[in-house]
């Protein structure tokens, strides 16, 4: 089988362009999908009762035509993000709406509007083919991919790609994601795989590390610097743990908000000292029907922060959980 030949070539250590450019491609490949005709399967259930094992499928899918600015990658490892979980339980909306809208953009985006959605927003792997306009990447190169898919035809995105009106999260708002044997990405999503990391290690940071970097470090983000005090929500999770480590590496002081003693220990193990267990403190920032905030609870949180920092407010808030923690 062609997939077996691709796997064997990668495991052999041969990375010559000629070898990979001439490897036969399979007619189909295995991919993790959700199906458009099942978007109502969890209707009426609470979020915690929706089981992704019922909605996720392993399907044989065809390889679509490659666009001029894309690369076809043999996936060696991928990772799970919350957007994959959201996709699998069709919350807060079905991702097929994203695919339908993207499909109206141009000839090549039309490929994404399918009755199935291949999920996954991280990968490490080896380039197999490149589109006609790709010059940096060649077959045989080991790569990782970040999740931001952009068109960059609009000037709004030239200084900051997050401002591109056509920016999307690959594998969430686009099709052909990374939880598959093969994946299609835009060439500008690719980066060289770090030689000192395993396939699994290099596949896991793409989405969360780049997001945390954009928020905290980049010139378009908070421009974190020595001495800053940073309030980090969800500090033990994927995004939060990178934010915590970045703050420590920059000589800043992270104030880590977590939800359990176990998660607090994860932060301590990373080197953080100032930690707030929000469940132990009993914070309730919104009323029972989530229509109004409670200012006194935010004031109580502020008092706790100042107790930990010696009377200082924070310089940066690293917020990513969503509405409940928007003060």
Residue spans of the language-model regions?
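A short N-terminal beta-strand-loop micro-motif at the entrance of redox/enzyme domains
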Residues: 6-24, 39-77, 110, 115-118, ...
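NAD(P)H dinucleotide-binding glycine-rich loop of Rossmann-like/cofactor-binding domains
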Residues: 109-114, 121, 149-234, 281
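NAD(P)H cofactor-binding loop motif with strongest signal on the N-terminal glycine-rich segment
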Residues: 234-235, 321
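Adenosine-nucleotide cofactor-binding segment
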Residues: 248-324
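N-terminal Rossmann-fold NAD(P) dinucleotide-binding loop
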Residues: 120, 240-241
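N-terminal Rossmann NAD(P)H-binding glycine-rich loop of SDR-like oxidoreductase domains
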Residues: 236, 244
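Glycine-rich beta-strand-centered segment in the early N-terminal region that forms part
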Residues: 62-79, 93-156
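Hydrophobic/small residue at the entry helix of a nucleotide-binding pocket
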Residues: 211, 238-239, 324-325
């Amino acid at each position: 089988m062609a997939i077996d030949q691709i796997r064997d070539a990668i495991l052999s250590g041969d990375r010559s362009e000629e070898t990979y450019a001439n490897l036969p491609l399979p007619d189909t490949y295995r991919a993790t999908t959700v199906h458009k005709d099942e978007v109502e399967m969890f209707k009426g259930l609470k979020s915690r009762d929706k089981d992704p094992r019922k909605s996720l499928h392993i399907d044989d899918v065809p390889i679509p035509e490659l666009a001029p600015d894309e690369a076809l990658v043999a996936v060696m490892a991928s990772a799970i993000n919350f957007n994959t979980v959201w996709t699998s339980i069709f919350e807060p909306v079905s991702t097929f709406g994203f695919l339908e809208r993207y499909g109206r953009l141009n000839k090549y985006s039309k490929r994404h509007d399918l009755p199935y959605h291949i999920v996954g927003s991280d990968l490490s792997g080896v380039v197999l083919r490149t589109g006609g306009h790709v010059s940096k990447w060649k077959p045989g190169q080991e790569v990782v991919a970040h999740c931001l898919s952009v068109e960059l035809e609009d000037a709004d995105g030239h200084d900051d790609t997050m401002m591109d009106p056509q920016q999307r999260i690959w594998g969430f708002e686009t099709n052909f994601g990374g939880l598959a044997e093969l994946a299609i990405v835009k060439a500008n999503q690719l980066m060289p795989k770090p030689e000192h990391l395993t396939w699994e290690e290099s596949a896991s940071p793409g989405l969360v590390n780049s997001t945390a970097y954009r928020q905290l470090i980049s010139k378009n983000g908070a421009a974190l610097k020595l001495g800053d005090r940073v309030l980090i929500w969800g500090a033990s999770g994927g995004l939060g743990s990178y934010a915590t480590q970045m703050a420590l590496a920059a000589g800043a002081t992270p104030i880590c908000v977590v939800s359990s003693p176990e998660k607090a220990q994860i932060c301590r193990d990373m080197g953080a000292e100032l930690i707030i267990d929000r469940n132990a403190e009993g914070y309730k920032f919104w009323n029972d029907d989530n229509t109004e905030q409670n200012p006194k609870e935010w004031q109580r949180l502020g008092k706790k922060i100042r107790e930990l920092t010696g009377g200082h407010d924070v310089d940066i808030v690293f917020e990513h959980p969503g509405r409940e923690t928007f003060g």
